């Protein structure tokens, strides 16, 4: 069953002319949620404004999801998105450049791909993660309004496995989280079986592990209904 979370969005501007409806995001990563395969199950999700991919899904899977949901998609690459798995295909648009900023349904998003792509193997690099974070920070991101952050690897100490090197979050991302305080940070990479909860709170930021799929409803200030899981 696809998980669901409601998040308050501090800027009322994107909700004008929506007649009280939330902005609905389908966030996916790492493995294809079986719910998305069956048309009847997809119908139960309801309309989606846009899709966010947080890495380690093939472009074929991403293209299928975007076509089946009938919504625009923005996504970044994970550590497994290399070689034949990442061959060019016409079924899906190109991945977002790391540290690129997008605008979807009136909401700003910034993505952070796995910071070690470019060769036959995706190596883990704290130095490159810091480089990503600093590039976004120098753009004065967040000064003109709130932003959704989406990455493959979570920030250090927020949805990660800090005792294991491979699934430990990046300290540069944690610095960026504390600097920007985005309302929402979406990520994958961390196996759901290894964590006690798929969502956490870091200051003003809701951090969500979207492995599989999560529907995120963004609500204007002071209008979030009770959250269902």
Each predicted region: which residue ranges?
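Active-site neighborhood of phospho(di)ester-bond hydrolases with catalytic His/Asp-centered motifs
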Residues: 27-30, 50-56, 74-79, 148-152, ...
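Active-site environment of divalent metal-dependent phosphoester hydrolases
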Residues: 32-36, 57-63, 79-86, 117-121, ...
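Conserved beta-strand segments of alpha/beta enzyme cores
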Residues: 24, 72-74, 95, 108, ...
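Binuclear metal-dependent phosphoesterase catalytic core
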Residues: 2-22, 88, 101-108, 125, ...
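N-terminal active-site segment of His-dependent metallophosphoesterases
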Residues: 1-66, 142-145
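Conserved catalytic scaffold of divalent metal-dependent phosphoesterases
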Residues: 28-35, 77-168
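A generic local structural motif
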Residues: 11-14, 36-42, 59-63, 96-97, ...
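A short, gly/pro- and small-residue-rich
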Residues: 69-79, 168-173
């Amino acid at each position: 069953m696809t998980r669901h979370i409601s998040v308050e969005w501090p800027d009322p501007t994107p909700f004008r002319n929506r007649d009280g409806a939330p902005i609905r995001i389908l966030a996916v990563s790492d493995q294809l949620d079986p719910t998305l395969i069956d048309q009847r199950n997809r119908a139960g999700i309801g309309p989606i404004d846009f899709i966010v991919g947080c890495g380690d899904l093939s472009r074929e899977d991403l293209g299928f999801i975007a076509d089946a949901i009938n919504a625009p998609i923005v996504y970044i690459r994970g550590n497994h998105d290399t070689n034949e798995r990442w061959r060019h295909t016409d079924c899906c648009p190109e991945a977002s450049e790391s540290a690129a900023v997008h605008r979807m349904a009136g909401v700003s998003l910034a993505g952070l791909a796995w910071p070690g792509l470019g060769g036959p193997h995706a190596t883990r690099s704290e130095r490159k993660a810091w480089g990503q974070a600093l590039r976004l920070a120098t753009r004065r991101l967040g000064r003109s309004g709130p932003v959704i952050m989406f990455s493959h690897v979570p920030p250090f100490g927020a949805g990660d496995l800090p005792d294991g090197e491979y699934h430990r979050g990046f300290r540069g991302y944690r610095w960026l989280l504390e600097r920007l305080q985005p309302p929402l940070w979406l990520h994958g990479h961390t196996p759901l079986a290894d964590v006690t909860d798929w969502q956490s709170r870091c200051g003003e930021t809701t951090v969500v592990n979207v492995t599989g799929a999560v529907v995120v409803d963004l609500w204007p200030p002071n209008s979030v209904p009770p959250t269902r899981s």
